[in-house]
């Protein structure tokens, strides 16, 4: 039998049980996601995808909106099941009635099936209508006692590829404080206290990636001492970030203009961390001064 070409996950379940968190989790796992798609549109959408090979992992949130829901979704499941090129699963999210009521009260939203405004009545009706679909689901997750982070971890464990289950990447970047802090930085380190190559005429137009500048920055005693402290701080905390489920940790190193000191430090840090972790290194403002000079 040929290998399935597309992975399809239909995410459904009780309103308030965590479908929004779930679809965000699938997006983090590389799935193409659509939230709240009407069941009748699913077959047409899958037919559209057959004309392209760009999407191989798809997650769809299908909500209960009417009494005809089960008949509509059953029709979808029958069509998908007969498609030999689609490997599909149903993820059903559930939670205790008491917890669902508490979540609705916290968000001050009304239940979609609560015609008279009573949340519990809507929950009971929805549970009754969804019971057949829950019985068909390959994956049922009770989110009553789960935090959003724990739900993301559960979904990752059940639906990610083996290579993704332990995925964790470190982004190291240099920047210049004069151009603003990186908005996506988790950790920021300031190296403006170190000797500045800018004041050495022969180094001014070079960057921290050039050996003369790199050596000038890193060979000072205070640089050597600070770098070792920095490395000793960062290396032990990376396993903790990974354990907590963080997929990317962004470490930013800044100097005044982001051309010399921060570039040298960030590059050395990235090279050392790359011995044990997947690392990407970038230098946001390395050429900013040169571009400004050229425009003037």
Curated annotation (Swiss-Prot):
Cross-referenced Pfam families: PapZ_C, RapZ-like_N
Gene3D superfamilies listed in its UniProt record: P-loop containing nucleotide triphosphate hydrolases
Keywords: ATP-binding, GTP-binding, Nucleotide-binding
Gene Ontology MF terms in the entry: ATP binding; GTP binding
Residues involved in ATP binding: 13-20
Leader peptide range in chain numbering: none
Binding-site residues, GTP: 63-66
InterPro entries named among the record's database cross-references: P-loop_NTPase, RapZ-like, RapZ-like_N, RapZ_C
Family the UniProt entry places it in: Belongs to the RapZ-like family.
Function: Displays ATPase and GTPase activities.
The protein's name in its UniProt record: Nucleotide-binding protein SGO_0954
